[in-house]
Amino acid sequence: MNWKLTDNKNWDSLEQQFRWVQDMNFVMQHHLHHEEGSVAVHTRMVLEALQQQPEYRALPAQEQEILWTAALLHDVEKRSTSVDEGNGIITSKGHARRGEYTARTILYRDIPTPFHIRENIAALVRYHGLPVWIMERENPVKKLCEASLRVDTRLLKMLAVADIQGRICKDKPALRKLPSYSRCFAVNRIAGERHEALQRVMPAFSTFKRRMGI
């Protein structure tokens, strides 16, 4: 029997079931990256975009539940990290890291979840922004390697694409650079076999570096 966060995925029902979903309505975002408004509006758009992806629809039912739950939780801790800098500029540094902790807590304390499912969801929340912003990191290849040891990068790529599609923003064309190196994020790690996983992933890293000129 597959694990599910909930049987009722209607947004109004989600708000009634989970206080942290209600909280999303009161968290605004940077006007440049999120003209759509609150975290609640963005999250709903992300969920809709995710469910329209052919790759998502082709996943086994359990993986769909894992990815859907990660999408619902991906910005949950913007509520605690958002700072209004003025002029529509709102930052939320550290929301992914804190969101990982919150996701893990919810899926342990509030909704008892099998360990491997809980950790997969928590890791997706932690790294959800990496495919979009990786080239701004000091060592992008190292970051990609780090993520591949913790998260199913096929699912991470799908989540990142939905995160881009599920927003209204002026810089959306720039964000669409993701597909140009999405193959690197589609390399799946082998759970519990890190050495073999690295051997499989490193050729993709080399291709990635050549394409990006790094």
PLM features: residue spans?
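Short secondary-structure junctions and interdomain/linker hinges
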Residues: 1, 5-15, 21, 28-31, ...
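Acidic/His-rich, divalent-metal-binding segments that scaffold phosphate/diphosphate chemistry
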Residues: 1-85
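Alpha-helical structural motif
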Residues: 6-20, 39-42, 63-65, 95, ...
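Phenylalanine-focused residue identity feature
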Residues: 18, 26, 111, 115, ...
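Hydrophobic, Leu/Ile/Phe/Ala-enriched alpha-helical segments that form helix-helix packing faces
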Residues: 50, 103, 107, 209-212
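Divalent metal-dependent catalytic cores for phosphoryl transfer on phosphate-bearing substrates
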Residues: 55-171
